[in-house]
């Protein structure tokens, strides 16, 4: 009886971990759709990331802002 209960608990734990990993895998894709516009706050290491044609300038942390590319 203890073995059956242990197996059930173990199965639930494994299922929970698998679902958490699946959800975590979708977060970067969702975050990639959103971008920060010119003069908005950004963070290259964690997001929000700057829109295309902009880069994240951190002249004074934590005041990082999206600036236009100069090239």
Swiss-Prot record:
Q: In which tissues or organs does this protein occur? A: Expressed by the venom gland.
General remark: Negative results: does not affect mammalian sodium channels (Nav).
Its domain of life reads Eukaryota
Task: Please name the GO terms that the record assigns under molecular function.
Answer: sodium channel regulator activity; toxin activity
| Role summary | Insecticidal neurotoxin that modulates the insect Nav channel (DmNaV1/tipE (para/tipE)) in a unique manner, with both the activation and inactivation processes being affected. The voltage dependence of activation is shifted toward more hyperpolarized potentials (analogous to site 4 toxins) and a non-inactivating persistent sodium current is induced (site 3-like action). Interestingly, both effects take place in a voltage-dependent manner, producing a bell-shaped curve between -80 and 0 mV.
Query: What InterPro entries does its record include?
Result: Beta/delta-agatoxin_fam (IPR016328)
Protein name, please?
U3-agatoxin-Ao1a
Q: What is its main location?
A: secreted
| Domains: entry comment | The presence of a 'disulfide through disulfide knot' structurally defines this protein as a knottin.
Residue positions assigned to the propeptide: 21-33
Origin species, per record, is: Agelena orientalis
